[in-house]
Amino acid sequence: MTFKSLFVKWFLVLATVPEVAAAPALLDLEYRPLAGKTAVNLNEQQGGKVLLVVNTASKCGYTPQYEGLEALHQRYGARGFAVLGFPSNDFRGQEPGSEEQIQEFCTLTYGVKFPMYEKVHVTGPETTELYRRLQAATGVAPGWNFHKYLVSRDGRVVGNWPSKVKPDDPALVAAIERELKAPAPKR
């Protein structure tokens, strides 16, 4: 048997191996809108958009970032961008309120209109599945409130920024604009 025929047989064997199932889509998960009763599928609701996923808190030094996050949402929303907020009490109890209290605070204090979802854990053994997936994709867990993960239109995590990076940071804004230039996937 020649090397060439061995290579051809090896290639044919590989070509007939069934394709391994794709990893679950990052957003193929259900979460309740903040203070809501019915969970929604994030992929059905937000899939195909460029997303900035942020763990939030109402009693944190970074809480004023809500204003900048809302500004991003307003500036780029019509182009297929959304901020997704996930309140968390994981860091020094800085989100102690009920979901109704959080919603009222965000709306009245910062005029938040971007989608906010149920209160979740973003670190530790009770980390919610979305944050497990974000961490697996980047190798980075939130170190504090207002950690930001940027998700492309096709559901890939393409960047993450720590809490100290403000929503209007030039590098973050450039990354959002770069992702918005990519065509939306066919749904």
Feature names for model-found ranges:
Residues 55-59:
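Amphipathic alpha-helical repeat scaffolds
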Residues 20-24:
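Boundary at the C-terminal end of the N-terminal hydrophobic targeting segment
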